[in-house]
Curated annotation (Swiss-Prot):
3'-to-5' exoribonuclease specific for small oligoribonucleotides. It comes from Haemophilus influenzae (strain ATCC 51907 / DSM 11121 / KW20 / Rd). This is Oligoribonuclease. Residues 8-171 form the Exonuclease domain. CDD domains: Orn. The active site is at Y129. The gene is orn.
Amino acid sequence: MSFDKQNLIWIDLEMTGLDPEKERIIEIATIVTDKNLNILAEGPVLAVHQSDELLNKMNDWCQKTHSENGLIERIKASKLTERAAELQTLDFLKKWVPKGASPICGNSIAQDKRFLVKYMPDLADYFHYRHLDVSTLKELAARWKPEILEGFKKENTHLALDDIRESIKELAYYREHFMKLD
């Protein structure tokens, strides 16, 4: 185990939709890497129970995607509240990274942060105020060197742990091919 302020916390949420005022968190996963993107540990992968009423209000894309990937079944079987999932995630992170040290890392991470602020505020407060958003590099590559985008393809399972693993691989790809740091 390597508790280090240089470690990076990667997080992904699946939600019932995109508006934190109306939608809720349905899955959370975390991974801790070292500063060079080597995976040190995978945190708990937690399906968060939500009511059938809320699940039935999800749009067609969410209904189809989360049915096909098995997440809806896991949500219905789960007894975990958002608070319980938040506490389990914090317990994991406290073993790896001091509070306030790591930026929140992921793809389109500002969206996840909006939900954390509303439904998991203690977890939101655990991060440094900065973001490490892989989608920023994707947007820059699309504008400055679009051919770079051809070399990395995502599977898009829309399961939180898979999405984090892909984000880490994607950043490593951009580091090597776009930023040319390797």
